[in-house]
Regions:
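A beta-strand signature from Gram-negative outer-membrane beta-barrel systems
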Residues: 15-54
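Transmembrane beta-barrel wall of Gram-negative outer-membrane proteins
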Residues: 70-171, 201-208, 215, 454-456
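Gram-negative outer-membrane beta-barrel transporters
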Residues: 532-534, 554-649
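Short loop/turn motifs that connect adjacent beta-strands in outer-membrane beta-barrel proteins
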Residues: 50-55, 84-88, 148, 216-218, ...
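Single conserved hydrophobic/aromatic residue that forms the stacking wall/gate
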Residues: 2-7
Length: 725
């Protein structure tokens, strides 16, 4: 699957429904015949292949989310068969999901006064309502020409629509004495988009391949075309403000700072407010991928094998945003009409704490119905600074590899190889001139580099049940497109600015892994491993507050940087087994668990003002992660309880440790159950519940108690029936 998220090189896994996936390949260690852009290993999503015999399956289900309080719809269908004496295989699938959801969110940023006292300088209450609709269609064909030659084709189309409304109350520029400007904002869209912000993401992938055998010599080839797009038509924001308000801010519990208006002040929309801004934007982002690869295998005596091949990947990505601000010609009449079309979003079930109440906002229907392009009602002006995030990027990665698999003895196998990747980049961004209020294209920038990536893997079969593996590999992590482009991305609604960095280098990783696996005679295994990674030039966002650019002061400034080098040490443990070793009657009960410990330290830290600071951990690297699953399987009944844990880790780095942002620890628990019966027609009833612990997305600033964001999504349940004919 080649579809990619706009602005990055991350595959869009949530765009593809789970029922369209046949298998998930996880590779902890990257071999020379795999793409090297995988410091932590690789994950490949394999869509459904054509079957060995006729297959007909249908799924129908529903679900419920406690925030949206609306039902979910899940539908799926699969048909597969073989034709012409089993020479031709066909599999077609379709999936549809409609999932209303939402979230309750509080966000804060913290500042330190000259007296050393800490206070909140930005305070937000947000409420989201989202409806996500997914449609997915896939087809797979294979043609067995003869015993030595086979052709395959796969195609998939995914369409994901997200309709989102957001209501936000913001105490902006909140000072230590409690003075602030109150901002009340509604995010909406036009009536043809349900009066909501529509984010339409479409991905398609078509792949043709062949497998051929010429005597002992084997080869395979693959050619693919992929296209991804993201459109946001008519995204609207209406924002009201009231200056010089006074608040009492209770910081006795820094996890939940709470502001209450002083006498004569308010944070509720009323006729004292004025229009801050009314905007509409169009966003269109497109990416195309062309790939071709060929692999050749030549066996030797004694089980040795030589494999070599080449691959070319050509990517193009364009981002285009158009942004307009509208001013009512009669602002008094506009404000009067706006205050007649409000909604109260206060909710006693607000999950961060019901003491936070979102309040009153302009209604989404009212915001969507505004005739903004009527010159007798509104003055229209294109906002040049918002166009500075547009870019065009081109990337070509040409690679070749050689891999030799050798049997040293009957029990020892060695794999050695070298991969060479040549990366060529060309990109054009935008610059914004505040004095002239114009945006212009930058000159096209070019960059190219070659990476030589050796690898060595060893496997020792101590006996049939005990295996020892060791490896050295070299991998890399390329910067995101949007990080490289010399552009300026300004979010006026949040007063934030992000600047690209064309000088970014790819992060390089030298990986050492050693593991031992013991397989039980009954189904199960226990394994232990250690690993070490030396990462050079890792990339992280540097954050600055109250940053001045082109004469404007922005609340938050972000720029990606090569921040230095890092060393990571870790251990991995896993255990999987049913309980039949205790008593045969317990064979139906089993346990699966994994645990990883990672110790990381940064060297040569080069952020301005923090050069060579010691004791810092690698961003994005939790010290502890664990997964556990307890299951029961018997007579068609399957029950599973799963738990996932990850400890906190640093996510973004600021001007000092006080401004560092951390992703807090998470505890997730899910449960699912199913019952299958029937022989010729198998019927399965299923039910599942996700996020049983109502785990929020939580960030904190500097110390654990200082909440930056706490966003709750609630528990989700699904149930339905699957029929296989």
């Amino acid at each position: 699957i080649a579809q990619c998220l706009v602005g990055s090189e991350m595959c869009i896994r949530d765009r593809i429904p789970a029922d369209m996936i046949q298998t998930i390949e996880v590779n902890k260690v990257v071999t020379p015949d795999m793409d090297a852009d995988a410091i932590g290993g690789s994950i490949n999503l394999i869509t459904k292949n054509s079957p060995y015999k006729r297959t007909i399956a249908a799924t129908a289900g529903t679900g419920y989310n406690w925030i949206s309080e609306k039902a979910q719809l899940n539908l799926g269908f699969t048909y597969g068969d073989r034709f012409f004496n089993d020479k031709l295989g066909l599999m077609i699938s379709a999936s549809y999901q409609n999932s209303p959801s939402g979230s309750y969110d509080t966000e804060f940023t913290w500042e330190q006064g000259e007296d050393g006292k800490t206070y909140v300088n930005d305070y937000q209450i947000r409420q989201y309502y989202v409806t996500r609709e997914r449609q997915s269609y896939s087809a797979a064909l294979d043609w067995d020409i003869n015993a030595n030659h086979k052709l395959t084709f796969k195609g998939i189309f995914n369409n994901r629509n997200d309709w989102e409304n957001r209501y936000r109350t913001n105490l902006k520029d909140l000072e230590a004495d409690g003075s602030a400007t109150v901002r009340i904002q509604t995010k909406a869209g036009t009536p043809d988009n349900r009066n909501a912000r529509l984010e339409r993401q479409r991905t398609m992938d078509f792949a043709l391949g062949g497998e051929h055998l010429f005597g002992p010599f084997a080869m395979d080839w693959h050619a693919s075309y992929a296209k991804a797009s993201e459109e946001r038509p008519n995204e609207r924001y209406i924002d009201f403000q009231l200056k010089k308000q006074k608040f009492n801010v209770d910081l006795s519990n820094e996890r939940q700072p709470f502001a209450t208006p002083k006498d004569g002040s308010t944070m509720t929309l009323n006729d004292k407010f004025s229009l801050k801004e009314l905007t509409e934007q169009q966003e269109d982002i497109k990416e195309q991928d062309l790939k071709f690869s060929a692999n050749f295998k030549l066996p030797f005596k004694n089980g040795n094998k030589l494999k070599f091949g080449a691959k070319v990947v050509r990517k193009t990505k364009d981002k285009e945003v158009d942004f307009y601000e509208y001013s009512p010609l009669n602002e008094d009449a506009f404000m009067e009409n706006s205050l007649k079309n409000t909604v109260d979003q206060s909710n006693k079930h607000f999950m961060p704490n019901n003491k936070y109440q979102a309040g009153i906002y302009a209604g989404k229907e009212y915001t969507g119905s505004l005739d903004l392009n009527n010159a007798s009602l509104f003055e229209k002006e294109q906002v040049q600074e918002e166009l500075a995030g547009n870019f065009e990027a081109r990337e070509t990665v040409s690679s070749g590899y050689v891999r030799f698999d050798q049997k040293i003895t009957d029990r020892v196998e060695l794999m050695s190889g070298l991969r060479i990747e040549n990366t060529n980049l060309a990109y054009t961004g935008r610059t914004y001139d505040a004095d002239e209020d114009i945006t212009s294209k930058t000159e096209r920038r070019h960059n190219s580099y070659i990476n030589f990536l050796p690898s060595l893997l060893m496997k020792w079969n101590v006996n049939e049940d005990f295996k020892v593996r060791g490896s050295f590999t070299q991998t890399l992590s390329r910067p995101k497109y949007s990080a490289l482009v010399p552009s300026v991305n300004i979010k006026r609604s949040d007063n934030e600015i992000t600047i690209g960095n064309p000088e970014l280098k790819p992060a390089m990783s030298y990986n050492f892994d050693l593991s031992a696996d013991y397989y039980f005679r009954s189904i199960g295994l226990v394994s232990a491993g250690v690993f070490y990674k030396k990462i050079d030039d890792f990339i992280v966002n540097q954050i600055s507050n109250n940053y001045e650019y082109q004469g404007n002061v922005y609340t938050r400034f972000t720029q990606p940087k090569n921040a230095g080098n890092a060393n990571l040490f870790g251990i991995e443990l896993s255990y999987q087994r049913d309980f039949s070793f205790i008593a045969p009657a317990l064979k139906c009960i089993g346990f699966y668990g994994t645990y990883t410990y990672t110790h990381s330290r940064i060297e040569d830290f080069n952020f301005e003002g923090r050069e060579n600071e010691e004791g810092l951990s690698m961003p994005g690297s939790p010290a502890h992660t664990a997964n556990a699953s307890l299951y029961f399987e018997k007579a068609g009944l399957n029950i599973r309880l799963s738990y996932n844990f990850a400890s906190e880790f640093i996510d973004e780095m600021g001007e000092s440790a006080f401004y560092d942002r951390y992703y807090d620890k998470v505890n997730y628990m899910d449960a699912n159950a199913s019952y299958t019966f029937g022989k010729k027609i198998k019927t399965t009833f299923y039910a599942e519940a996700n996020n049983l612990l109502n785990q929020p997305l939580r960030y904190y600033q500097g110390t654990k108690d200082r909440t930056m964001q706490a966003e709750y999504y609630g528990v989700k349940v699904n149930a339905g029936v699957k029929i296989n004919f």
